[in-house]
Amino acid sequence: MSIYLDYNASSPINKDVIEYMVDVYSNSYGNADSRTHIYGENARNIVENARKDIADLIGVQAGEVFFTSGSTESNNIALLGLKQYANDVNKKHIIISSIEHKAVLEAARSME
């Protein structure tokens, strides 16, 4: 029996999620930002329903859920928000651990 411990980069996907995504990828190939046709509308509905489901799951408003292209973009957005907050409350330092993800370290270094 093996045990997978590297959940930082990837993780196993729930079988229900795989089944749902296969259906989406097979039948809903419109661009969610192209709402001038039914394919875009269908894709937009899928995205917005997912946003609402996630918001309900974590107890926030749907407008507070943002989708990004991946962890690097998410880390950058979070750190830029933290930097703005630190500036607003007149704090001069953000402390980052040396064992953080490379994207976090690089984003923090760019703020020095």
Predicted regions: what they are:
Residues M1-E112:
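Pyridoxal 5′-phosphate
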